[in-house]
């Protein structure tokens, strides 16, 4: 009987242990699955963390195994022995567990915990209120009136309104991923209409909410492209009769989502692996894209058109949809484009429809009747080399590539140059030109003559008069045309030169806007000489309503060709840096002989395209990556110069004090500083550097890691750009800066300024425009605004991160140098030279055969050399594989976006003086940026010595308490033993 009792006790003990293990595993699985579904982490993140921290739990596992063996082996021993064995095993296990958790928390998980446990400040209600007003102002100035037949808008005399479309109850406020929406509750579309004075038909609201409440997820790890629209047959006769009696006015909302991690589907019947669509059967035919309206939406529009006199369609999509359907319905008389307006921007939509705000936005992209006419259509997407091998640690089975064969002819520059002179053909292809937008009032613009001043300056002015009956703002757009020689340097026929927005003009009021430009602003990059040049001949500067419709033309003549050694604002001479990026055997589009090579240049690449040898080598890093040769002396380290980082605030980059400060750092200090750059820069005790925080994203400060961050979600970048108001961008930057200053956030992962190369780009909402001049102007102003309050803005993604497909698997992007410089680098150059950017995030992709983060020509020769950039450069999320920290440091990258140092983020070769010098240079860039931020403002300097973070103090306090508890438990065990087993 006693033997059975001991056996039963053994099994109970083992059952408890196994049960605890199962419960822990189940909880971990549920938590990890939730994080993956929310897009917070990927399986790669989980595996890297397990690989990094798992080894620390091996002793704990061994101890647990020994305890289990002991329970089995000793289960027949005396009761007193088993009493001691079980209790001492439990206490030992708890002690080792506490020790292990401590080692992991202050070791590999310390950087992540430093962010997750950040002690952030509270943004005042006054600042949040001002941010909300700025958000609403941007949305109001950025929304574009596309159609207003019979002056159907505004609905200023009526309150009742019907709102159709499932998206009306689930509109998009922004995109997903790093540019996603923050924690503060948004004003929804219905509330925006109510706040403007409307009374929406709530029967329709309840109908759509009953159909489906949540929006399908389009995130990094999940792409559900379902368009939840009720079938026309589900609209009951009773509900429609009520709606007709309620109002003759109807608003229809159609939205399209997008986000980080995936481009939009070109063919809804052939989705990429892992993507899903659960919409109504037959919604799309073969070859129809996500940017077309589906069958159910069309039937809904037919029903609305049949039952209501005045129908206005709201396009809630950042990506340019095919909007030809707006011409298919007799009662669809109005249309407004409003992509993600941020948390309060739908108030602006209500005010526009009500007539309280005059729409003054202009399109930032060209809208086509058929997106297949985009010049990049056949060279945007998933293309794999036929001879590619699996990229190391990327999870991709092949080597991906994309050919930018359209060259400089992106967006309107292609359509205006190729079709602009043939108005009939142009109108059949282009529905709405770049820069297009209507108003409720009328304006007349008159342009002065050109005045040529000294040093190549040209000045002119434009006077705008409100000739209508309503107050409103107008946009002034000026473009240039440079002389083109057949077969010479490629030049678009139309190029945005300068733009501005008027103040609010009452009827009869006018405003004169003055412009001064450099002749060099009209220069083209000559790949033969590696210089920007102005060819001799006649130059036109045109005042236009948009990229197509001319108001006035002025011209000047240049007698002799000018070649610029360097552009105004540059610090070093320009030379060819990207010859290899052009690739071999790729045909690029040319204007020669009226685009004679268009068919060949714009064709899709062959399925049997083979990777060049250089690609096979440079995309399998670190297998082919070698440590730099050890040269020179080891830099001074651990010096006792008694300097603190705070003392360097305001000092020039070249001040001798920097060398003395850097001498104080140990090699391990430098390694730590450059490694753990994930949403932060770490504390370094030797120089009294405090912990700082860098947060996402382009729509305002947000975080995947820190929950309940109370900051503002501003309108999407393309809506900001659609204001065509540089001051609006500056205002947005200032509010981000104010919120960052209040919260204790020093770095902002934004703005993003890649180009809308193709309508299907997943992050179109996050980028400004298809035009680099517009993008660069907006970016520079946002950066200047944030900098005013000590927040350094990470201009991103440097460079050419223009598609999401294959971006993390080392996609090789091939482009000629002219297009790289004139189109894809120009916004960044403007951000540096005009916006004085001090932080940069580079990109996952390769330019040619070199990863951006290890591209010396890009990082050192152009960014730091030509442009004179002194700030820090960080990788995009450090994902291993082709990303290698030693290679990055050697080629101009300073900081790894890593929270755990895994997957090669931690530089190796600490005894190599070359590596140490590279880390020292990187540390200089990081520290120079940080010390001139709000982290070292007058108030912040007081706490600059606080290098022991609050979460560590709490951890140490908990450790002391646990040790005391363990000691007390041990005393209790001794007491119980003596009481129970006294001889």
PLM-predicted stretches and their roles:
Residues 1-524, 533-547, 566-983:
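Glycoside hydrolase catalytic-domain context in secreted enzymes
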Residues 530:
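Extracellular/periplasmic metallocenter environments
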Residues 549-567:
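Short beta-strand elements
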